[in-house]
């Protein structure tokens, strides 16, 4: 900043002043007049404050980042599934192991085991793989008959200050294979993906995706006019491809294992709820796999009955 300094000599005279009141005029004095030059933005030594639009755009960016699916936990579910050509008998009650997946994509040690005690029952329970006592983290109970959806029960001994909770896995409708779960953590839905979603998953996985199940968190938000709008956020996906499905199973196998990817960022600072969400995702994913096996067995039974009755 440059300044211009001038020296001025000033003499004051009083107009119409009474000489008796002011006997002597005031003395002459000198003053400096300083003219400030215009400050250019480039010459300022301080950083200017950010514009409002910059702050607003940054806020939008941070909000949209949470809507992008980013897996914070990956698990490999190993299950042989049910082949296309076989008798519609109940599968063997072999335990389903769920393994941790490292940051490099390598499979680590087992984290959970889903145990089905009896072959003629679909009910099962989930335990820690290293728990010799096999204390259930949650149990899934299947009931026979229409209008009786399976229930997942989160056991109260797993989490501090938490009562047991029963969660129904309800079908969304007759013409869809999607299911809905209403919990204290929110409302969640398992559904089968669209072709566009499979192509997007193929880009991230690096190979063709045979089957993709998506776990959505469903929320109701208020909009203008006093109405409510449904919003969805993907919190999980179950990917089955040539490299991720259980070894020995095929593309046409029903209920085979694959890679479960979970986005648990919303619950990172709430340890108990994060663990509850992880267990719920694993148990409900295994339930979706069983649903595929039941569907395959039903189709096989219908085919056998049609052939025995001499159908067209």
Stretch-by-stretch model annotation:
Residues 2-107, 184-312:
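Low-complexity or membrane-interfacial segments used for flexible interactions
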Residues 94-175:
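Short N-terminal edge-element motif at the start of the domain
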Residues 150-152, 165, 177-179, 211-213, ...:
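One face of beta-strands
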Residues 155-157, 182-186:
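Short strand-coil-strand connectors
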Residues 170, 178-183:
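Long, contiguous regulatory modules within eukaryotic nuclear regulatory proteins
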